Amino acid sequence: MSKILIFFIILFSALQSYEIKQTPIKFSQKRVELTKQYIRQHYGLKVEDIKITPQIILIHYTAIEGFKKSLARFESETLPNDRPDINKAGSLNVSTHFMVERDGTIHQLMPLNYMGRHVIGLNFNSIGIENVGGEGFVENLTVEQLLANIFLVNYLKKRFETIEYVVGHHEYRCFEDTELWLEKDDGYRTKKFDPGPSFMRDLHANIKGFKKAPCD
């Protein structure tokens, strides 16, 4: 992305105000109990609730082009049978705190202080942002989504002073040798491509005060 375009993105994002639409997925006591079970199984922690202290903002794409289809993947409380890559790791369905449409519309799907299942090893200390797009693992997120993500990470930093990192899903394994990594199953890893290095480079070029993934 050119320096001129980045300048206009910074200028526009400073002036832009966003509404966060409340679009809650189903999160009954059943999902809470499944989350506790996941925490015990994968992190070796016995918890009374599923509240988190976020230190990482984890950026994703849905790998599905439509908002309604993307949202539907998170609605069920139990994991569908078409996810053999993660089915063995528990019946808790995936979830995310936010979803951003192609036009930049922002939806909050679940409480920000609840743990969602959206990344191996880092769920217990991260907030997830899913961006609609990336079908076929193509880096095709929009400028509107970039602007919305800039707004969201700054909004979340104001809400949670504990947040330090803004990281792409494809970078999650860079945390394996850090204190933030909690996964106990050495055989539970998947290869991720989202949202891709270009989007993360543009995002970090337009935000300040956040650490990148410790990949070097």
List where the protein language model places each region:
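Sec-dependent N-terminal signal peptides
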Residues: 4-13
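Short, conserved "active-site rim" segments that organize catalytic pockets and cofactor/ligand binding
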Residues: 40-106
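Solvent-exposed loop/turn segments at secondary-structure junctions
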Residues: 63-67, 103-106, 112-117, 133-137, ...
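Solvent-exposed, acidic/flexible segments
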Residues: 50-52, 91-92, 119-122, 138-146
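Short, solvent-exposed loop/turn and secondary-structure capping segments
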Residues: 68-74, 109-111, 121, 178
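Macrodomain-like recognition of ADP-ribose-binding/processing modules
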Residues: 18-40, 49, 93-98, 103, ...
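Basic/polar, cationic surfaces and motifs that engage anionic cell-wall
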Residues: 18-33, 135-216
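Short coil-to-beta-strand
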Residues: 57, 120-129
